[in-house]
């Protein structure tokens, strides 16, 4: 219940949480030995030349037991009219059942005209078999409107490669990345938007940062303002924060030029704070967008 309370403190609606019991009673029960737990990840943030490192404990977690039919999707998408559906590559690869649930979830959302996004977010420690990951992820991408993934994600999670090598000038890399996105968009004509954050690490605590969105229908790249050589506190959460801010901007009716700026701003702000759970306000995001566009410094708020 501690996790539920923390979610409530952050303003998250917890009414749809599925609770597993340990008394061997009901549809979501274990063997009465308490063998299910909530997932844990432990991250060393890194410092200087020492890279960050994350370890996961996902075995015996309740979420791995969720499968098709376990979530009342009619209630979510029909009765409640949820406007946006999102899932990611960590959840989808936790177990065969979560993969099936993710496909069911995205298909149901699509039937109701709900916008759907999928963050590839490949983690080899969750699913080391890339061929297996490709097969699962391709089913979900076929049910997606907004796809999120960096160069490594597209290679590891879907099997797409870019022509550019690591370390090439940014413009050369962006051209190669855009060419790859055009191939992805041709293969999955359901996709409306593809995006990613771009992090160039100079050390564990100093990066350059931007983001791009590719409008598949207009064949147009939208790039956020580049932030160069920025000191950060903790690199975790930058990708999730990029995606969530882009989604928020689109849901507010903003264009892609503005949406990508929101995504980049939110992403860098979360990397300036410990952990990967945002406590950043919309006001802070808009302020950072304005600051970056002006190329200005940081003034104290009094």
Where are these regions (language model features)?
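Conserved N-terminal subdomain of the carbohydrate kinase-like
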Residues: 1-89, 286-302
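Anion (oxyanion) recognition and catalysis
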Residues: 8, 103, 107-111, 141
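Hydrophobic beta-strand scaffold residues
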Residues: 14, 116-117, 148
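Short acidic-glycine loop/turn motifs at beta-strand connectors
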Residues: 46-48, 214-220
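Active-site beta-loop-alpha junctions enriched in small/polar residues
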Residues: 59, 90, 121-125, 152, ...
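Conserved phosphate/ATP/ADP-binding segment of small-molecule kinases
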Residues: 112, 126-217
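Conserved post-catalytic alpha-helical subdomain immediately downstream of the catalytic base
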Residues: 204, 220-292, 300-302
């Amino acid at each position: 219940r501690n996790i539920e309370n923390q979610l409530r403190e952050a303003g998250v609606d917890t009414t749809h949480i599925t609770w597993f019991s340990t008394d061997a009673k009901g549809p979501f029960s274990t063997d009465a030995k308490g063998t299910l737990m909530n997932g844990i990840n432990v991250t060393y943030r890194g410092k200087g030349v020492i890279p960050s490192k994350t370890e996961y404990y996902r075995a015996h977690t309740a979420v791995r037991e969720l499968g098709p039919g376990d979530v009342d999707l009619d209630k979510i998408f029909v009765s409640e009219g949820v406007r946006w559906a999102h899932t990611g590559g960590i959840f989808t690869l936790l177990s065969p059942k979560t993969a099936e649930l993710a496909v069911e979830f995205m298909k149901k959302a699509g039937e109701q005209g709900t916008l759907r996004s999928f963050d590839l977010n490949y983690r080899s420690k969750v699913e080391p078999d890339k061929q297996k990951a490709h097969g699962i992820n391709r089913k979900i991408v076929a049910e997606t409107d907004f796809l999120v993934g960096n160069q490594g994600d597209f290679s590891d999670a879907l099997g797409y490669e870019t022509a550019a090598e690591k370390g090439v000038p940014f413009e050369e890399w962006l051209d190669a990345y855009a060419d790859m996105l055009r191939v992805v968009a041709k293969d999955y004509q359901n996709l409306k938007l593809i995006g990613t954050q771009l992090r160039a690490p100079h050390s564990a605590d100093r990066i350059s940062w931007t983001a791009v969105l590719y409008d598949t229908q207009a064949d147009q790249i939208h790039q956020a303002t580049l932030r160069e050589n920025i000191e950060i506190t903790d690199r975790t959460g930058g990708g999730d924060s990029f995606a969530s801010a882009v989604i928020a901007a689109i849901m507010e009716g903003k264009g892609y030029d503005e949406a990508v700026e929101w995504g980049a701003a939110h992403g860098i702000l979360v990397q300036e704070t410990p952990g990967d759970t945002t406590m950043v306000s919309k006001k802070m995001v808009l302020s950072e967008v304005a600051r970056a566009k002006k190329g200005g410094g940081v003034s104290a708020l009094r």
